[in-house]
Curated annotation (Swiss-Prot):
Its EC number is 2.7.7.-, 2.7.7.108. GO terms for molecular function: AMPylase activity; ATP binding; magnesium ion binding. This is Protein nucleotidyltransferase YdiU. The active site is at residue 249. Nucleotidyltransferase involved in the post-translational modification of proteins. It can catalyze the addition of adenosine monophosphate (AMP) or uridine monophosphate (UMP) to a protein, resulting in modifications known as AMPylation and UMPylation. ATP binds at residues 85, 87-88, 108, 120-121, 171, 178, 259. It holds the Pfam family SelO.
Amino acid sequence: MQISNSYLQLGDDFYLPSTPRQPSNPQLFLWNQGLAESLGVADFLAQEQEDPAGFFSGGRLLPNSKPVALAYAGHQFGHFNPRLGDGRAHLLGELRGDTDMVFDVQLKGSGATPFSRGGDGLCGLGPAVREFIMSEAMAALGVPTSRTLAVVTTGDEVYRGDAVPGAVVCRVAASHLRVGTFEYFYAQGNKDAIERLCDYAISRHFPELASSEGPEKYSGFLRAVFSRQVELVCEWLRVGFVHGVMNTDNTTISGETIDYGPCAMISTYNPNTVFSSIDAMGRYRFGHQPSIAHWNMARLTECFLPLLDQDSKQATAIGESLLGEFPQNFEQRYHHMLASKTGVRLQGDSDKALCEDFLQLLRKQGLDYTNSFDSLTRSLIDPQHEDRCASQWPEWYQAWSARIEQQGRPREVVAEGMRRHNPVVIPRNHHMEAVIDECIKNGSPDAAKSWLKVLRRPYQDLPTTPNYQDPPADGDRSYQTFCGT
Ligand SMILES: Nc1ncnc2c1ncn2[C@@H]1O[C@H](COP(=O)(O)OP(=O)(O)OP(=O)(O)O)[C@@H](O)[C@H]1O
Ligand SMILES: [Mg+2]
């Protein structure tokens, strides 16, 4: 295990040195052994006979770590803030994983930094447990995401209305480059920094662009970032994830999900679903996420206008044309995803319509998204589910069965294919709240660990899976999530 600090070479405009806060009594709460092994952290700890709690709470520094808080700006709910930055996070450095990819290792909740703007720099145990469970569930679902290596309780209290136990999350991500990182320099008119940042992003995420130059490099870069966002949002829609705070400072260049603050899962299918208490206008509602990703990509494109062409009119035309590809690319990828969930091969518009009709039925009947697709998948190989689906959706199910038959693949094969896109279990909101409450009340991670066993196999029926499949009694109508906790 060798920590590197490549980000620091970008120059001191990009970050501010900041030392994590000393916790009074760091205790390991949750630990991701698989991730620790893949990063060489497990071997390091075994060799040194060290406990992870000190290193992953900020109490002690890993060898060669030079902690910094990263500078970034961001559009929050549409309004630009030129200076946000890591107000409660410390980048410890980078580690090379067993697949040779390089990952950032960052602490969150590790104390105030020069970017804290009056905030306390801390994190409560509840949100830390949420970040661990959600990110690990998303990774197991196959959704691009930052990971969580550890949650360490600090032994200190954090004030969030009441006193709550404090914790530090250790996050591992392909990088922490955000759209807001580019916006930070664009707002300062620092074209040179944007060029350097772009080269750095290419070296970490898009090495295939390394040999391109000039405007071609920049349009290639934008296309590559757009494509990752298209993929990411399609994956969110596939599993029913609502990010909740898709500000440009929470939008990564790598295309990974980051910041599990006010996120939630839909139960009843409704594109207008919004859970975040501060999202009064529903800007970040479930079905609006593709448009917001597009809007965020427009903010990124703006930062590149001076680099796309010297003539500003020409540059705007190039930017608009690149952005114009986004909705079409999204539609195409989305229909493909929906068809995979529905088991249909897309051979024409009538296949698209068949898949969309199913969503309309779920909406009209107020049905659970995950369980309905699960039942549809099972109906191909289980007569009980077949009867249930046939009576729930008489006309549609007949049309669908006929189409599946017509497309000529054996039912078992179609069911297997659908299963890869339809989880049997997701991190449902009511279970999340119950598990977090239990962890805090008992001062024990056991409830989280039992749930994680199931969430790490979201496409399989384990003996304890049924404990977590029930939709919320009220369809989550009164469920609310909160930011900045
Ligand atoms: N308790 C806090 N103290 C200081 N700064 C904070 C605190 N909570 C949030 N911030 C800062 O406010 C901004 C927006 O917060 P947001 O909730 O999006 O991020 P976050 O959850 O802290 O971190 P990340 O995006 O890295 O997951 C960020 O600059 C963040 O560092
Ligand atoms: Mg954030």
